[in-house]
Protein backbone atom coordinates (compact mmCIF):
# COMPACT_ATOMS: atom_id res chain seq x y z
CA UNK A 1 0.00 0.00 0.00
CA UNK A 2 1.53 3.29 -1.10
CA UNK A 3 2.00 6.06 1.44
CA UNK A 4 -0.22 9.11 1.10
CA UNK A 5 1.30 12.57 1.42
CA UNK A 6 -0.45 15.90 2.02
CA UNK A 7 1.05 19.39 1.88
CA UNK A 8 0.25 22.89 3.04
CA UNK A 9 1.93 26.22 3.75
CA UNK A 10 3.03 27.47 7.16
CA UNK A 11 3.46 31.05 8.33
CA UNK A 12 2.03 34.37 7.20
CA UNK A 13 3.34 37.00 4.82
CA UNK A 14 3.80 40.73 5.17
CA UNK A 15 4.98 43.39 2.74
CA UNK A 16 8.32 45.10 3.39
CA UNK A 17 9.88 48.06 1.59
CA UNK A 18 13.46 48.34 0.42
CA UNK A 19 15.58 51.50 0.40
CA UNK A 20 14.06 52.53 -2.94
CA UNK A 21 10.49 52.15 -1.71
CA UNK A 22 9.79 48.93 -3.62
CA UNK A 23 7.67 46.34 -1.80
CA UNK A 24 8.61 42.69 -1.49
CA UNK A 25 7.03 39.74 0.37
CA UNK A 26 8.45 38.32 3.57
CA UNK A 27 7.09 35.17 5.19
CA UNK A 28 7.07 35.13 8.99
CA UNK A 29 7.30 31.70 10.60
CA UNK A 30 8.18 31.03 14.23
CA UNK A 31 9.02 34.73 14.74
CA UNK A 32 11.63 34.54 11.97
CA UNK A 33 11.53 36.35 8.64
CA UNK A 34 12.14 34.42 5.41
CA UNK A 35 12.86 36.03 2.07
CA UNK A 36 11.45 34.23 -0.97
CA UNK A 37 11.81 34.80 -4.69
CA UNK A 38 8.74 35.27 -6.94
CA UNK A 39 8.55 31.59 -7.88
CA UNK A 40 8.79 30.45 -4.27
CA UNK A 41 6.20 32.99 -3.19
CA UNK A 42 3.83 31.87 -5.95
CA UNK A 43 4.02 28.26 -4.79
CA UNK A 44 3.73 29.23 -1.13
CA UNK A 45 0.70 31.51 -1.61
CA UNK A 46 -1.08 28.87 -3.71
CA UNK A 47 -0.51 26.28 -0.96
CA UNK A 48 -1.72 28.61 1.77
CA UNK A 49 -5.21 27.79 3.14
CA UNK A 50 -5.12 24.61 1.08
CA UNK A 51 -4.37 20.99 1.93
CA UNK A 52 -3.19 19.38 -1.26
CA UNK A 53 -1.29 16.54 -2.87
CA UNK A 54 2.08 16.93 -4.61
CA UNK A 55 0.66 17.05 -8.13
CA UNK A 56 -1.87 19.70 -7.09
CA UNK A 57 0.95 22.03 -6.03
CA UNK A 58 2.24 21.88 -9.60
CA UNK A 59 -1.23 22.40 -11.06
CA UNK A 60 -1.94 25.48 -8.94
CA UNK A 61 1.51 26.91 -9.69
CA UNK A 62 1.18 26.35 -13.45
CA UNK A 63 -2.19 28.12 -13.52
CA UNK A 64 -0.89 31.13 -11.56
CA UNK A 65 2.33 31.36 -13.57
CA UNK A 66 0.40 31.27 -16.86
CA UNK A 67 -2.02 33.95 -15.64
CA UNK A 68 0.86 36.19 -14.53
CA UNK A 69 2.98 35.48 -17.62
CA UNK A 70 5.77 34.28 -15.34
CA UNK A 71 8.55 31.90 -16.44
CA UNK A 72 11.47 30.42 -14.55
CA UNK A 73 13.94 27.78 -15.70
CA UNK A 74 13.96 26.21 -12.25
CA UNK A 75 11.33 23.47 -12.00
CA UNK A 76 8.47 23.80 -9.55
CA UNK A 77 9.65 20.49 -8.05
CA UNK A 78 13.01 22.01 -7.05
CA UNK A 79 11.33 25.15 -5.77
CA UNK A 80 8.82 23.18 -3.70
CA UNK A 81 11.57 21.02 -2.21
CA UNK A 82 13.47 24.15 -1.16
CA UNK A 83 10.35 25.48 0.58
CA UNK A 84 9.96 22.13 2.36
CA UNK A 85 13.57 22.22 3.56
CA UNK A 86 13.05 25.74 4.93
CA UNK A 87 9.82 24.70 6.66
CA UNK A 88 7.65 27.14 4.72
CA UNK A 89 5.80 24.18 3.24
CA UNK A 90 5.06 21.16 5.40
CA UNK A 91 4.29 17.57 4.52
CA UNK A 92 2.33 14.91 6.36
CA UNK A 93 2.39 11.25 5.41
CA UNK A 94 0.59 8.07 6.37
CA UNK A 95 -1.08 4.92 5.13
CA UNK A 96 -4.51 6.61 5.04
CA UNK A 97 -5.71 10.14 4.36
CA UNK A 98 -6.55 10.53 8.05
CA UNK A 99 -3.05 9.43 9.09
CA UNK A 100 -1.47 11.84 6.60
CA UNK A 101 -3.69 14.70 7.77
CA UNK A 102 -2.87 14.00 11.41
CA UNK A 103 0.85 13.86 10.65
CA UNK A 104 0.53 17.17 8.79
CA UNK A 105 -1.42 19.10 11.43
CA UNK A 106 -0.68 17.57 14.83
CA UNK A 107 2.44 19.62 15.59
CA UNK A 108 1.27 22.86 13.97
CA UNK A 109 0.38 25.88 16.10
CA UNK A 110 -3.00 27.49 15.44
CA UNK A 111 -3.19 31.26 14.98
CA UNK A 112 -6.60 32.92 14.44
CA UNK A 113 -6.66 34.75 11.09
CA UNK A 114 -7.86 38.14 12.27
CA UNK A 115 -9.81 40.48 10.05
CA UNK A 116 -11.73 37.94 7.98
CA UNK A 117 -15.15 38.83 9.47
CA UNK A 118 -14.46 42.55 9.09
CA UNK A 119 -13.57 42.00 5.44
CA UNK A 120 -16.75 39.96 4.88
CA UNK A 121 -18.84 42.70 6.52
CA UNK A 122 -17.24 45.32 4.26
CA UNK A 123 -18.07 43.27 1.16
CA UNK A 124 -21.69 42.77 2.24
CA UNK A 125 -22.21 46.48 2.99
CA UNK A 126 -20.62 47.51 -0.30
CA UNK A 127 -22.77 45.10 -2.34
CA UNK A 128 -25.91 46.17 -0.49
CA UNK A 129 -25.23 49.87 -1.15
CA UNK A 130 -24.72 49.08 -4.81
CA UNK A 131 -28.00 47.16 -4.91
CA UNK A 132 -26.16 43.95 -5.79
CA UNK A 133 -26.99 41.96 -2.64
CA UNK A 134 -30.37 41.24 -1.08
CA UNK A 135 -30.92 40.45 2.59
CA UNK A 136 -30.94 36.77 1.72
CA UNK A 137 -27.71 37.15 -0.22
CA UNK A 138 -26.06 38.91 2.70
CA UNK A 139 -27.16 36.10 5.01
CA UNK A 140 -25.59 33.52 2.70
CA UNK A 141 -22.32 35.46 2.67
CA UNK A 142 -22.16 35.21 6.44
CA UNK A 143 -23.33 31.61 6.61
CA UNK A 144 -19.77 30.31 6.21
CA UNK A 145 -19.04 31.63 9.71
CA UNK A 146 -21.67 29.39 11.31
CA UNK A 147 -19.33 27.31 13.43
CA UNK A 148 -19.84 23.86 14.88
CA UNK A 149 -19.43 23.32 18.62
CA UNK A 150 -15.93 21.93 18.06
CA UNK A 151 -14.91 24.83 15.82
CA UNK A 152 -16.08 27.35 18.43
CA UNK A 153 -14.05 25.63 21.12
CA UNK A 154 -10.94 25.49 18.92
CA UNK A 155 -11.12 29.19 18.03
CA UNK A 156 -11.66 30.10 21.68
CA UNK A 157 -8.60 28.12 22.77
CA UNK A 158 -6.46 29.50 19.93
CA UNK A 159 -7.26 33.05 21.00
CA UNK A 160 -6.09 32.43 24.56
CA UNK A 161 -2.63 30.94 24.02
CA UNK A 162 -0.10 29.72 21.48
CA UNK A 163 -1.52 26.22 21.17
CA UNK A 164 -0.78 23.26 18.91
CA UNK A 165 -3.25 20.92 17.27
CA UNK A 166 -2.25 18.09 19.63
CA UNK A 167 -2.73 20.35 22.66
CA UNK A 168 -6.16 21.39 21.37
CA UNK A 169 -7.14 17.72 21.06
CA UNK A 170 -6.01 17.12 24.64
CA UNK A 171 -8.08 20.08 25.89
CA UNK A 172 -11.15 18.91 23.98
CA UNK A 173 -10.81 15.37 25.35
CA UNK A 174 -10.73 16.80 28.88
CA UNK A 175 -13.59 19.22 28.20
CA UNK A 176 -11.38 22.25 28.83
CA UNK A 177 -12.69 25.44 27.22
CA UNK A 178 -10.69 28.11 29.06
CA UNK A 179 -6.92 28.12 29.55
CA UNK A 180 -6.39 31.91 29.92
CA UNK A 181 -2.74 31.89 28.76
CA UNK A 182 0.32 29.70 28.16
CA UNK A 183 0.66 28.93 31.88
CA UNK A 184 -2.94 27.76 31.99
CA UNK A 185 -2.25 25.60 28.94
CA UNK A 186 0.66 23.91 30.68
CA UNK A 187 -1.48 23.21 33.74
CA UNK A 188 -4.32 21.83 31.60
CA UNK A 189 -2.35 19.60 29.23
CA UNK A 190 0.89 18.53 30.88
CA UNK A 191 -0.60 17.16 34.09
CA UNK A 192 1.57 14.04 34.46
CA UNK A 193 5.24 13.16 34.23
CA UNK A 194 4.79 11.13 31.04
CA UNK A 195 3.20 13.72 28.71
CA UNK A 196 5.73 16.08 27.11
CA UNK A 197 5.84 18.39 24.12
CA UNK A 198 7.92 15.71 22.37
CA UNK A 199 5.39 12.89 22.68
CA UNK A 200 2.00 14.63 22.90
CA UNK A 201 1.32 14.12 19.18
CA UNK A 202 1.59 10.35 19.62
CA UNK A 203 -0.28 10.41 22.94
CA UNK A 204 -3.47 12.13 21.79
CA UNK A 205 -3.90 10.40 18.42
CA UNK A 206 -5.96 7.66 20.06
CA UNK A 207 -8.29 10.04 21.89
CA UNK A 208 -12.01 9.73 21.13
CA UNK A 209 -12.35 13.35 19.99
CA UNK A 210 -9.27 13.29 17.77
CA UNK A 211 -10.93 12.80 14.39
CA UNK A 212 -13.67 15.36 15.10
CA UNK A 213 -11.10 17.92 16.29
CA UNK A 214 -8.83 17.29 13.31
CA UNK A 215 -11.68 17.75 10.82
CA UNK A 216 -12.77 20.95 12.59
CA UNK A 217 -9.24 22.39 12.46
CA UNK A 218 -8.91 21.49 8.77
CA UNK A 219 -12.28 23.14 8.02
CA UNK A 220 -11.30 26.31 9.88
CA UNK A 221 -8.00 26.41 8.00
CA UNK A 222 -9.36 25.96 4.47
CA UNK A 223 -12.05 28.57 5.23
CA UNK A 224 -9.20 30.99 6.02
CA UNK A 225 -9.95 31.34 9.72
CA UNK A 226 -6.68 29.84 10.97
CA UNK A 227 -3.01 30.24 10.10
CA UNK A 228 -0.46 27.52 10.83
CA UNK A 229 2.76 28.41 12.61
CA UNK A 230 5.70 26.75 14.31
CA UNK A 231 7.36 27.58 17.61
Predicted regions and their residues:
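Phox homology (PX) phosphoinositide-binding domain
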Residues: 2-6
Amino acid sequence: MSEMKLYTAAGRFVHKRDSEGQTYPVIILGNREYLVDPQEFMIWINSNWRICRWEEIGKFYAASAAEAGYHNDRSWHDCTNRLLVRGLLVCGSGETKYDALYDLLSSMYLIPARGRIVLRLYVVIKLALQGRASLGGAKRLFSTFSHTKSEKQILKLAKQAMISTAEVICCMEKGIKNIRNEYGLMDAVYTDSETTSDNICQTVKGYRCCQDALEAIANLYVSQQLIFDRA
